[in-house]
């Protein structure tokens, strides 16, 4: 097991305790390294806080049980107002504009590594914070700090953390980033932690498991419209463009069409002006493919970013294979990205995250697609 910053032994670390196995093992590993460890549990959602939807109470119970087992303090904090103002309203605005946002990325930026870090600094006098994310940090001889992909390729979460600043990365520790997921569970089981076999959380950051269309419909009125083929034939109805994303295959309700082949139907475009969902057959339909994209709202971990003309790789969604590409800066905040080969289902509103080998450089928001 790789050691974590032995030169900082004795420093105070506040661990974001979620009630899951990754944060539980993070706290244990840091204690083993000699850090002074305390936990902090965040509650960030108030609406619909009931047994059906919200597991916050159960998560807090598990976090407390782990901290009791490890013999460390557990603090609690409510960031619901910050979450609503800085994450959820952005999430709704993007969907209303017809884009597909990634709330987990904004949640990390505004809550886990901003509000949390501020609280750990101002109230708990922390030297570092730590999270159970599968990423790594590297401190270089020149004083710079880089964020690296996690050792477990299947669990690497650097895509969700590209908005972190150099300063935030330098103040953060990521113990499980050096491990495979199965190793984390094995450590938790060996230590008798209640979370060792707890299911990984999915769904919207901090909002949890719920029916997405029903949940979104509580905040944005649905606007049903036509489903058309790429050739303009009306073949069905959709319940709202905000519920659909490029490349989507399931839930379209248009199977068994006459005069069509057996290839599955995919969302290939969204016509916002006409409120029309455009579909085509086959996962490599021409309307689904892009030769490149324009990316704005750029953020680079090292503040500088890659050089003009750099040939690096990009991910346009989580767990995607690396896409080789070439970069051209159109201005300080807009990047033209040309793929080596056409790519399917690149989605405006999602994040494009760039890598040089194992180093996460940063990224931005996909604004426009380059086709043809």
Curated annotation (Swiss-Prot):
Record's InterPro entries? MnmA-like (IPR004506), MnmA-like_C (IPR046885), MnmA-like_central (IPR046884), MnmA-like_central_sf (IPR023382), Rossmann-like_a/b/a_fold (IPR014729)
**tRNA-binding in keyword set:** yes
Gene3D superfamilies, sorted: Adenine nucleotide alpha hydrolases-like domains, HUPs, Translation factors
Gene Ontology CC annotation, any one: cytoplasm
Localization per Swiss-Prot or TrEMBL? Cytoplasm
Key word Membrane present in the record?
no
| A biological-process GO annotation | tRNA wobble position uridine thiolation
NCBIfam families, A to Z: PRK00143.1, trmU
Which named protein is this? tRNA-specific 2-thiouridylase MnmA
Organism listed in the record: Shewanella sp. (strain ANA-3)
